[in-house]
From Swiss-Prot:
InterPro entries assigned to the protein according to its UniProt record, in alphabetical order: Ribosomal_uS14 (IPR001209), Ribosomal_uS14_bac/plastid (IPR023036), Ribosomal_uS14_CS (IPR018271)
Function: Binds 16S rRNA, required for the assembly of 30S particles and may also be responsible for determining the conformation of the 16S rRNA at the A site.
Annotated organism of origin: Blochmanniella pennsylvanica (strain BPEN)
A matching Pfam family: Ribosomal_S14
Presence of keyword Transport: no
One of the record's GO molecular function terms: rRNA binding
Keyword set, alphabetical order: Ribonucleoprotein, Ribosomal protein, RNA-binding, rRNA-binding
Biological processes, Gene Ontology terms: translation
Self-association state and partner proteins as the record states: Part of the 30S ribosomal subunit. Contacts proteins S3 and S10.
A GO CC term assigned to this protein in UniProt: small ribosomal subunit
Protein name from the UniProt record: Small ribosomal subunit protein uS14
Family that this chain belongs to: Belongs to the universal ribosomal protein uS14 family.
Amino acid sequence: MTKESIKAREIKRLKLVNKYYTQRISLKKIIIDQRIPNEERWNAVLKLQTLPRDSSPSRRRNRCRHTGRPHAFLRKFGLSRMKVREAAMRGEIPGLRKASW
């Protein structure tokens, strides 16, 4: 099990990403657009740097909802492979069953 502080940190990052998403996207569009004057683009870069570091989506880490485990995470279920297996064996995930051939 992951420490509660690490889970809380991920939740905080998710909130920051959602809060600054539109602002970050608009600044990145300005930075990429070659038709905009260089000075204005440079100002956009400086504004982007002033945003909180944790507001960047790449700082987030996918974690299991139950355990907080960062590795072997299955996006479709939001769980780690072990918790998916346990839930499948109990029949809690509709349409998912153990393979046999």
